[in-house]
A protein has these predicted regions:
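Catalytic-loop region of hydrolases
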Residues: 36-112
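Conserved alpha/beta-hydrolase
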Residues: 137, 143-164
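Primarily recognizes the serine-hydrolase "nucleophile elbow" in alpha/beta-hydrolase
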Residues: 187-258
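Short, surface-exposed "cap/lid" segments of acyl-processing enzymes
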Residues: 95-100, 108-146
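Accessory cap/linker subdomain of secreted extracellular hydrolases
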Residues: 239-346
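Bacterial N-terminal signal peptides that target proteins for export
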Residues: 10-22
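C-terminal motif of bacterial Sec signal peptides marking the signal peptidase cleavage site
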Residues: 30-32
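Alpha/beta-hydrolase active-site loop
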Residues: 172-195
Length: 347
């Protein structure tokens, strides 16, 4: 029975995600520019290295989407084989220091004048799910290859904390680093295209993201629109976003007795901010035992799957958070947390 429930849940999630992907693809074809306005010279020197990984065949994508995911309509978007490349590029860490990050680039084979698309990935717990790692044949990279097969060159940033930076904690829902890692991935991608003499069409880049990727997409859009950029955002599509972190945090703490869709996400968020902003209180002031010990022992170090992480956390927020933390927050006594959250609000 348990396996059947999990299978149904996965099918429902695949259906929901495919419907969002299908709508996004239709918008891409409808709204994308068609004029060829390639950049003559890269403005930023960010690309460090590139490596060809593999080619994803149309038949493999059709097997995944039509057979495994049960989405026969996906076949109409699968028009090209897709070459997958891993790249390493320069970006900034949480302290503004230079650091090498990684990502994947998906190039449709023999596609005439493909458009540009950057996909910011959703919340992940395992480094194996990072785009450049591409650990399994049915990986997230394989799933996103449908966008490239439809006729787009796709940039997939890992974010900090994954790929070549997997030895460091991921700054979860952190505006500055999500925006910079995604933006610098695009800059490195443009250099990659020029170095490999790959032509593309348009003077803008479409941006999409789901869950944490939706937050990253809006942060990236803001960065591109307010700072120097050789490209401007074209279509911007976001699914299941949380932009107003302060209001979301208020709601969560005021409704800790209500069912939570992703307890692990809230634990990840609080642990990440505790690390980024060096909160003065120990984790045990926020999380009940034994969850505080599990988090301190590396629950979010990228070595475990989402199911493994979830199995080590409670099902309710009241079990996760200490009563003293909840009371402090309600009394307006969590200045460090509230300040950090407000700094990352996007609305």
């Amino acid at each position: 029975m348990g396996n059947q429930v999990v299978h149904r849940e996965r099918q429902m999630e695949s259906m929901k995600y495919f419907k969002w992907q299908a709508l996004t693809l239709l918008l891409l074809f409808t709204l994308s520019c068609s004029d060829n306005n390639n950049i003559d010279e890269p403005v930023f020197e960010t690309l460090v290295s590139e490596d060809f990984n593999r080619t994803i065949l149309q038949s493999s994508m059709e097997f995944f989407w039509v057979t495994l995911a049960g989405q026969p309509d996906a076949a109409s978007y699968i028009n090209h084989d897709v070459d997958v490349y891993r790249i390493i590029y320069q970006t900034k860490d949480i302290n503004g220091n230079s650091i090498e990050a990684s990502g994947a680039i998906l190039v449709p084979v023999n596609a005439p004048q493909p458009g540009l698309l950057s996909i910011q990935h959703a919340t992940i717990f395992s480094n194996n799910e990072a785009p450049s790692v591409d650990a399994t044949q049915n990986s997230a990279t394989t799933r996103k290859a449908i966008f490239a097969s439809a006729g787009n060159i796709v940039f997939l940033p890992d974010y900090l904390g994954y790929g070549v930076t997997s030895d460091q904690p991921h700054p979860y829902q952190h505006k500055e680093t999500l925006a910079s890692a995604s933006f610098d991935m695009i800059m490195a991608g443009l250099e990659f295209l020029e170095a490999n003499e790959i032509e593309w069409s348009g003077s803008s880049i479409d941006l999409i993201g789901y869950s944490e990727g939706a937050y990253a997409t809006l942060a990236l859009t803001e960065k591109m629109e307010t700072g120097p950029s050789p490209l401007q955002p074209g279509l911007v599509s976001m699914g299941a976003p949380i932009f107003d972190l302060s209001s979301t945090m208020d709601y969560v703490i005021n409704n800790v007795d209500q069912p939570a869709e992703c307890v692990a996400c809230y634990a990840y968020f609080l642990e990440s901010y505790h690390t980024i902003y060096s909160f003065s209180r120990p984790l045990s002031d926020y999380f009940n035992s034994p969850y505080d010990e599990r988090i301190m022992d590396g629950l979010f170090d990228g070595s475990q799957s989402s199911a493994q992480v979830a199995s080590q956390l409670p099902e309710s927020m009241t079990e996760l958070f200490t009563d003293s933390f909840i009371q402090r927050y309600l009394n307006g006594e969590e200045d460090e947390l509230e300040s950090a959250v407000a700094e990352n609000d996007l609305l």
